[in-house]
Design a protein with these regions (language model features):
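Flavin-dependent oxidoreductase catalytic cores
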Residues: 1-228
């Protein structure tokens, strides 16, 4: 829906890399990309490099154009599986995962992460450098640590520091709910683009409006009757 309404790109919801969990109607629907506008970017989560590599291959066989690795989810049920943002505490394992997935597929591999595990361990820039050196094609960084969850305001200094260290595309994420904020974040961080997450809930027009206004065009949100 966001793509249809003007977003430049959309990424799937996080899908666990364990293919034994894919045999449900919900999972089957996630693997069906009929009539979806490309590029199709599928986000995978897990902790086992081989399992993630196998999942990446399976998604490509089902039509994925991009594989996105999740290092950002802060949910406890994901952390209990040592996946999502929990991986940021194990840089050696992250490197193994990056290598395995990049070697497994012939499509671009990207990563979504947080700035670090907690405010005293903001190792996002280090992992972003690792991603670039191991062949990933883009980094999306949310401006909070895992321990921050979604509390307080996103901080963009770590994203700016990351921009100074890598040359691959960097996408800033966190609290971007207007064109003014998007423009300021891109200016302050040097990010190549912004990603909008929670801001689209109930407002799928937001990404298209921001994209249009950043390009110097005007796009008006439809009236309430049309939205309903």
């Amino acid at each position: 829906l966001c793509r249809d309404l003007g977003a430049g790109m959309a990424i799937s919801e996080m899908i666990h890399a364990d293919q034994a969990l894919w045999h449900t109607r919900k999972s089957s629907n996630r693997l069906d990309h009929t009539d979806e506008p490309g590029p199709i970017s599928m986000q995978i989560a897990g902790f086992d490099p081989k399992m993630l590599a196998d999942a990446a291959r399976a998604h490509v066989e089902h039509g994925a154009d991009i594989i996105d690795i999740n290092l950002g989810c802060p949910a406890k049920k994901v952390l209990k599986k040592a996946a999502g943002s929990a991986l940021m505490r194990d840089e050696a394992l992250v490197a193994e995962i990056f290598r395995a997935v990049v070697d497994a597929v012939d499509v671009p591999v990207t990563v979504k992460m947080r700035t670090g595990w907690d405010p005293n361990n903001r190792n996002g820039p280090t992992i972003a450098q690792m991603a670039e050196s191991l062949g990933l094609q883009a980094v999306t960084m949310h401006g909070r640590t895992r321990c921050d969850m979604y509390r307080g305001d996103a901080e963009y200094d770590t994203i700016k520091r990351t921009r100074d260290l890598i040359r691959i595309p960097l996408i800033a994420n966190g609290d971007i709910a207007s064109t003014a904020v998007a423009r300021q974040v891109m200016q302050d961080t040097g990010a190549d683009a912004v990603m909008i997450g929670r801001g689209t809930q109930g407002d799928p027009w937001l990404p298209g409006i921001i994209a249009a206004e950043l390009a110097g065009h005007t796009r008006v949100r439809p009236d309430v009757a049309t939205q309903i």
